[in-house]
């Protein structure tokens, strides 16, 4: 099977991650997945949401948005509408959950790391790109806490990355572009850690149903893609990559609280 952009079924689009893309943020990255491009910045706020005050641990949250002309037709800015849309709220909650899964929250103290993920060009896979690029920005932001003596070790327990898989014309395919995503019979978004544990699996049949065997082969394909993405995260983080996971013995803070943003 030759896909709409010439790739093989198990082939990802070219992925590039540019670290330190924003000179002001504690951590930042530009991630390019094919023609999808997302700027991710991580900022540290020395306070936590009300529900965590006095708990002695931190929080990781995210905001997600798209530039008006990130797509073929100009969209209205959500700031003009006065509130984020339902899709943006769903995506930013997914990003927050995914990143919290690999953070030692007690080691943060009562601090919040805020990820801003802004899509400057969309061609499918914006939410999965935001998670993968957001992780790199998160790690650099966390390193500032080590540099400042807030914590002796990087409070990141594992890698996390995400990709999409789906059934397109009956074939299992990896990393769907927009044209494939729009026409796929089944579409999954998969988030996994570097040690191979699932954080989230979102799967939908678009006008059709699917079997357990389809789920298995789609997840197997997602594992291949996410392993590749984690290797790229390792490469771009350089020497800092070796610090990730050194706190893995203390995972009590890695779980999220409820489904707040």
From Swiss-Prot:
Q: Which residues bind phosphate?
A: 87, 125-127
CDD domains associated with the record: RNase_PH_bact
Q: Does the keyword tRNA-binding apply?
A: yes
Name of the molecule in the record: Ribonuclease PH
Family under the similarity heading: Belongs to the RNase PH family.
One GO biological-process annotation of the entry reads: rRNA catabolic process
Q: Which InterPro entries match?
A: ExoRNase_PH_dom1, ExoRNase_PH_dom2, ExoRNase_PH_dom2_sf, PNPase/RNase_PH_dom_sf, Ribosomal_Su5_D2-typ_SF, RNase_PH, RNase_PH_bac-type, RNase_PH_CS
Supply the EC number(s): 2.7.7.56
Q: Which GO terms describe its molecular function?
A: 3'-5'-RNA exonuclease activity; tRNA binding; tRNA nucleotidyltransferase activity
Q: Which UniProt keywords apply?
A: Nucleotidyltransferase, RNA-binding, rRNA processing, Transferase, tRNA processing, tRNA-binding
User: What role does this protein play?
Assistant: Phosphorolytic 3'-5' exoribonuclease that plays an important role in tRNA 3'-end maturation. Removes nucleotide residues following the 3'-CCA terminus of tRNAs; can also add nucleotides to the ends of RNA molecules by using nucleoside diphosphates as substrates, but this may not be physiologically important. Probably plays a role in initiation of 16S rRNA degradation (leading to ribosome degradation) during starvation.
Which species does the entry assign this protein to?
Answer: Desulforudis audaxviator (strain MP104C)
User: Which reaction does this chain catalyze?
Assistant: tRNA(n+1) + phosphate = tRNA(n) + a ribonucleoside 5'-diphosphate
| UniProt cross-references to SUPFAM superfamilies, sorted A to Z | Ribonuclease PH domain 2-like, Ribosomal protein S5 domain 2-like
Assembly and partners are described as: Homohexameric ring arranged as a trimer of dimers.
């Amino acid at each position: 099977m030759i896909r709409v952009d010439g790739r093989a079924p198990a082939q990802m689009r070219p992925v590039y991650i540019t670290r330190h893309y924003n000179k002001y943020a504690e951590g930042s990255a530009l991630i390019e997945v094919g023609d999808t491009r997302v700027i991710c910045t991580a900022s540290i706020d020395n306070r936590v949401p009300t529900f965590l005050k006095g708990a002695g641990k931190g929080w990781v949250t995210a905001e997600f948005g798209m530039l008006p002309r990130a797509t073929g037709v100009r969209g209205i800015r959500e700031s003009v509408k006065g509130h984020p849309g339902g899709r943006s709220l769903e995506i930013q909650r997914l990003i927050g959950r995914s990143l919290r899964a690999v953070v030692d929250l007690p080691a943060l103290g009562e601090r919040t790391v805020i990820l801003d993920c802004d899509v400057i060009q969309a061609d499918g896979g914006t939410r999965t790109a935001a998670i993968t690029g957001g992780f790199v920005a998160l790690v650099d932001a966390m390193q500032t806490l080590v540099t400042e003596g807030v914590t002796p070790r990087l409070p990141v327990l594992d890698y996390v990355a995400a990709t999409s898989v789906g059934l397109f014309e009956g074939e299992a395919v990896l990393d769907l572009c927009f044209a494939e995503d729009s026409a796929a019979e089944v579409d999954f978004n998969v988030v996994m850690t570097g040690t191979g544990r699932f954080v989230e699996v979102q799967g939908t049949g678009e006008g059709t149903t699917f079997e357990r065997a389809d789920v298995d082969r789609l997840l197997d394909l997602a594992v291949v893609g996410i392993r590749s993405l984690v290797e790229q995260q390792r490469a771009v983080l350089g020497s800092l990559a070796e610090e990730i996971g050194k706190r893995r013995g203390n995972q009590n803070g890695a779980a999220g609280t409820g489904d707040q943003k």
